Design a protein with these regions (language model features):
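NAD(P)-dependent Rossmann-like dehydrogenase/reductase catalytic/cofactor-binding core
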Residues: 169, 177-271
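Short, hinge-like loop/turn segments at secondary-structure boundaries
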Residues: 59-62, 101-105, 154-156, 268-269
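Internal alpha-helical scaffold of NAD(P)-dependent oxidoreductase catalytic cores
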Residues: 35, 76-149, 155, 161-199
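Rossmann-like NAD(P)(H) cofactor-binding subdomain of soluble oxidoreductases
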Residues: 2-96
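Generic structural signal for helix capping and beta-alpha/helix-loop junctions
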Residues: 50-52, 94, 146, 208, ...
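Alpha-helix N-cap/loop-to-helix initiation residues
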Residues: 24-25, 118, 227, 248
């Protein structure tokens, strides 16, 4: 396997899999251009509402851009929405030290085209990932899965950073569980206006978080280790969608304000 910290050393690729924190992607788009050829597919495995969400969505919101996840249209213009293949990353992991990834649980990477088609490129990367021992189904309604995962990221991440607490605690505590529930219900109201169908209910989603155990969310890890916190894509984007769909988000607004202040106080957020 060839590796380099300079994309120009590698040249155009068939697939470029992007798994950075959402706020880290726009600044590196210019540096990734040597990897992108005429037929390159960008597999976007980034948490939060994806920058391409309204590409080929088939509604009157077609082409809507989200400033919270793609400031200045860096990805929309630099990658191009037609190149993108969506991906929902399920494994839980921690970074105990630079260069070391500790896998906690999970091996599923759901894939999906923005228009829901089972394209040749989606099936090809699915086959390659499956051959490596991973679960990589191609979904016709990937946005549904995006929201089910976002339910957790939207609520568990900021609450864990504010508390601070691990998943097993915040999902069962009599004070924080209702906060997570209210945030999820507000998000569900937004998503359903956008045509999303949830395969599970909020209580089951929270129970699923508790079942992961004493896991420290990525936002809590970032806070503890002094890294910039992924607030805009996980929480701010849902607030932005609330404004787009004219949906009230009082609990999300409150938790977002507190989380931003906590992060600013630690020097980990400048928005």
């Amino acid at each position: 396997v060839r590796a380099s910290d300079n994309a120009a050393d590698l040249g155009p690729q068939d697939y470029v899999i992007v798994t950075l924190k959402a706020h880290s992607v726009p600044p590196v788009v210019p540096h990734m251009q040597p990897l992108i050829g005429e037929n390159t597919t960008i597999v976007s495995g980034v948490n939060g509402v994806p920058w391409w969400y309204f590409h080929k969505i088939g509604t009157d919101l077609e082409g809507t851009r989200l400033e919270t996840v793609d400031p200045g249209n860096a990805q929309w213009d630099g990658f191009g929405p037609d190149r993108v293949l969506g991906c929902v990353v399920y494994p839980a992991a921690e970074v105990p030290e630079p260069g070391v990834i500790k896998h906690i649980e999970g091996n599923r990477f759901s894939l999906g085209e923005p228009d829901g088609s089972k394209s040749e490129r989606a099936q090809a990367i699915s086959k390659a990932l499956s051959a490596a021992g991973l679960k990589a189904p191609v979904r016709p309604r990937l946005r549904d899965e995006i929201w089910v995962k976002l339910w957790g990221n939207l609520s568990f991440n900021p609450i864990s950073a504010l508390a601070p607490a691990t998943l097993d605690v915040l999902c069962t505590d009599e004070g924080t569980r209702p906060v997570a529930r209210n945030m999820m219900l507000e998000a569900q109201a937004i998503a359903e206006k956008l045509g999303v169908k949830f395969p599970i209910d909020v209580e089951r989603r929270i129970d699923g978080g508790a079942a992961v155990g004493a896991h420290r969310t990525s936002m809590l890890q970032d806070l503890d280790q002094g890294r910039p916190m992924e607030i805009d894509a996980l929480v701010g984007s849902v607030q932005e969608l609330g404004r787009v769909t004219d949906t009230p988000t009082p609990t999300i607004d409150t938790v977002l304000a507190l989380t931003k202040l906590r992060a600013r106080s630690a020097g980990l957020y400048s928005g």
